[in-house]
């Protein structure tokens, strides 16, 4: 089962497509609007932690230890009794502020997307889906192609 919260009700354990709940604001937990239109101050009171599943805090504030090797709680990976696995997980980072251990919808920053870096052009302040610039190659940092098509690779 997915550790990510449902985008409709905010609860862990199912996906939005399977949710029967009325859509609630992710910030204040009330119907009729979404978080971006919420007039209430940002809060974690109704948010559900992706690490432990409890409400009232987000992953970056969670005190429950979770092993990145076996995904069990109570210990961290360097203390894990299971054989070490090659990690294919990327660290969670916020697309809004660039900070670690939380996602944009959990971000407490009010000042828009200033820390956001576009994956298409590499500039700050917008996301790839809104980019008007040419693609930037991660290999040579030139525009017009992506790394898999790089002539310098």
Swiss-Prot record:
Its main location: cytoplasm. A zinc finger (CCHC-type) spans 4-21, 23-40, 47-64, 65-82, 92-109, 116-133, 135-152. The keyword Hydrolase does not apply. SUPFAM superfamilies: Retrovirus zinc finger-like domains. Present with 96655 molecules/cell in log phase SD medium. May act in the sexual differentiation pathway. This is Zinc finger protein GIS2. It comes from Saccharomyces cerevisiae (strain ATCC 204508 / S288c) (Baker's yeast). The lineage of its organism: Eukaryota, Fungi, Dikarya, Ascomycota, Saccharomycotina. The gene is GIS2.
